[in-house]
Amino acid sequence: MKKNITYIFIFVFSAILFSCNDDFLEKAPLDELTDANFWESELQVKNAANGCYWTLIGKDMMINISEGLSDNALWYTLSGWRQVGSGLYGSDFSTLDGRYKDAYKQLRRCNYFLANYKRAEGIVDSKKLEQYAGEVRFLRVFIYYYLTCFWGDVPFITEPLPPGDERLFDARTPRSEIVDFMLEELDAAAKTLPRYIEPATTSFGRISGAAAKAMESRVALQNERWTVAKAACEALMPGGEYAYHELYTTGRPNQDYFDLFTFEGRASRKAGNKEAILSYVYNFDLPSPTRHNLSRELQVPDQIIRFNATKSMVDSYLCTDGLPIEKSKLYKGDGTYTPAYSAYDSVFVNRDPRLKQSFVYPGYDKWYGKVDGRGTANAAEDASKTNVFRSPKFNNDGKGAVTYTGYYIRKYCEPSKVPLYNQDDNDIIFIRYGEVLLNYAEAMFNLNSLDQDVIDKTINKLRDRVGMKKMILTELQSNGLDLKTELQRERRVELFMEGHRWYDLMRWKQGYELGVDKSETPERQEKGLMKGIRKDYAYDPAVFTATTKFDDKGFLIFDDSRVFSSPKNYLFSLPYRQMELNPNLKPNNPGWE
């Protein structure tokens, strides 16, 4: 099998050059560990740039952290990033301290490269040299993007400082100034990078000019720089300077969206997928394999699944008439049926096709979670259909995949990898063209320029791929639907399990979706409860215990402990340890003082 860009993550020198386990303010200068002759070949420069790619941390950043913070799908234990998203942590929480320290370690790698790469001038082709510098400038922005989203104002360092340097103890720089820097850096980096990188080539996984412009649109959107976001998106759309990428489709509306996130469509090995602009590439076939465990985590066949999707996520999908479930006559999930458990099947009927391409549904025939909620009933009905899913399993008896909410995620699940522990090497997409279209639509809405033509170029392109009814402005109005709400719904549905939801909620000031905010209305407080299926959807409701909680309509309440306080939880607390090391970081963020 082809060996591709995964090699950029596997080399010994950068591990020696850049590894460090001490606190950010206590680490040794990297230049003391560097041979004086290191910058004397392109391979050496490339290896140094490659060392900075660890910044992306693949599945950990986009799924474990970014998705783990959200209300889309909850991690199976109340720990780590789920605990942060739940608002149930303090300034001494180790998860945040670790992320903060790692970010500044990664920044030092980038700063070190950018302070030294020109030592190779006259040895390495100048265009190639600036390309590597452009990649590292992008990666440095990537770090600052998450730092500013998490903590707002943060220490702003753009050069490798020696231990004890007084600048290490500076106060925090305003977020707005760092955003200005990020946008300028991305625009400049794009000019030094190849316009795009073709899928299924040895360079796929490296950063392109298109990736820099897409990241520029993301940074600008998150920070409400609507005009900048609009221009960055237009540079990637037809007629733009960086136009190349397009939505992945093979003309199979019931399959293409799902395939985009499996081996069938992974861009590192499939030349036909031009949607992925930047992906973290894994390869289990290398001598030193790179891998993750996502597919198994979604259907772990003898334990509790790791990501438990919520009722609010499933409810977000429209019916095929383009209406929300509470307005559509086509929605069947509210009815009563005989047998009662068949109501679970009805949840998936007459819905946006992306629902069945994102979630396991009754009749799904690539189920590797072993025994489902019907137990031996599967074999009794048809012994040949052991891989057909029928009902959710709540009984944790070690015989099958257990869900806490009643839903199993199908998106990003490569069926062939479910039985294999930690052997998944599917790409993890960081930026794709579908996000660019959604960024453009939101920017245009906020510029009061979102008309039917823009919707047709963005939202309806995404819907066309799956054969979903188009969004029509006049129909939204006639059905009493709010355009802003529907744009936000589209973003949640299309980008589910891609690590965007928490950032979107922070931008939209909708933190009450993450946990109960006592300052909000009762209706909004209800949104902070994480729920699952209706009790009678279960094949055998007797699996629920006396302590299982349900709301007044019979829907399972999976987690009612989550809290959100505004403005406090719109930013994280600065880590206590870091404030001890540098008192100039104080005061802490609002609400955390």
PLM regions and their residue ranges:
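Bacterial Sec-dependent N-terminal signal peptides
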Residues: 1-30
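Structural register within alpha-helical repeat arrays
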Residues: 133, 140, 209, 216, ...
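An aromatic- and glycine-enriched ligand-binding surface/loop that stacks and positions planar moieties
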Residues: 21-79, 209-216, 220-388, 515-530, ...
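Conserved, well-structured interaction surfaces
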Residues: 41-58, 79-151, 167-180, 186-199, ...
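C-terminal substrate/ligand-recognition segments
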Residues: 345-460
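TPR-repeat structural position
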Residues: 179, 226, 450-452
